[in-house]
């Protein structure tokens, strides 16, 4: 279950109902997908082949199709980041720069953890700490950045309206 940390007042929201309500009020789509259906050989696997990535997409194909039909998403892929990723530190530096996109930024966490820091409607940033099974859609034009948690590893399904609209604007 995702958790929220509000930056300026360092308050945490950990209750599932309160997390969902907070994100809904901020215009952030949040869903919990059934991660238990992921085959064992893909759990906590950060060295994925193209076949592994295709299998992950197949496992969650119904959920991807459902959210895509509701929200107008047209493309998806799988990304894996870990300490074995070449230039991980350089990638994280870029990810941690505040930016926005002209399309939603959608991520479903398959393994590992990630944090989206999002500027709220009142101008205060809040972290959404994500774990396996969490899907988030950062709204278009919302200022945000992404980083990894202390384990420095994540596998995520990325879902796009268009890949062109997903280019970061700093």
UniProtKB/Swiss-Prot annotation:
Cofactor(s) annotated in UniProt: Fe(2+); Ni(2+)
Stored Gene3D superfamilies: Jelly Rolls
Annotated site (May play a role in metal incorporation in vivo): 98
Pathway: Amino-acid biosynthesis; L-methionine biosynthesis via salvage pathway; L-methionine from S-methyl-5-thio-alpha-D-ribose 1-phosphate: step 5/6
Pfam families: ARD
Enzyme class label: oxidoreductase
GO molecular function, one term: acireductone dioxygenase [iron(II)-requiring] activity
Xref: InterPro entries: ARD, ARD_bac, RmlC-like_jellyroll, RmlC_Cupin_sf
Cofactor comment: Binds 1 Fe(2+) cation per monomer. Binds 1 nickel ion per monomer.
Binding of Fe(2+), residues: 99, 101, 105, 144
Known catalytic reactions: 1,2-dihydroxy-5-(methylsulfanyl)pent-1-en-3-one + O2 = 3-(methylsulfanyl)propanoate + CO + formate + 2 H(+); 1,2-dihydroxy-5-(methylsulfanyl)pent-1-en-3-one + O2 = 4-methylsulfanyl-2-oxobutanoate + formate + 2 H(+)
EC number(s) stated in the UniProt entry for this protein: 1.13.11.54, 1.13.11.53
CDD domains found in the cross-reference section: cupin_ARD (cd02232)
UniProt: Ni(2+) binding residues: 99, 101, 105, 144
GO biological process, one term: L-methionine salvage from methylthioadenosine
Marked site positions, Important to generate the dianion: 107
Site residues by UniProt (May play a role in transmitting local conformational changes): 104
Swiss-Prot/TrEMBL keywords: Amino-acid biosynthesis, Dioxygenase, Iron, Metal-binding, Methionine biosynthesis, Nickel, Oxidoreductase
Family: Belongs to the acireductone dioxygenase (ARD) family.
Role description: Catalyzes 2 different reactions between oxygen and the acireductone 1,2-dihydroxy-3-keto-5-methylthiopentene (DHK-MTPene) depending upon the metal bound in the active site. Fe-containing acireductone dioxygenase (Fe-ARD) produces formate and 2-keto-4-methylthiobutyrate (KMTB), the alpha-ketoacid precursor of methionine in the methionine recycle pathway. Ni-containing acireductone dioxygenase (Ni-ARD) produces methylthiopropionate, carbon monoxide and formate, and does not lie on the methionine recycle pathway.
Quaternary structure note: Monomer.
Protein name: Acireductone dioxygenase
Lineage: Bacteria, Bacillati, Bacillota, Bacilli, Bacillales
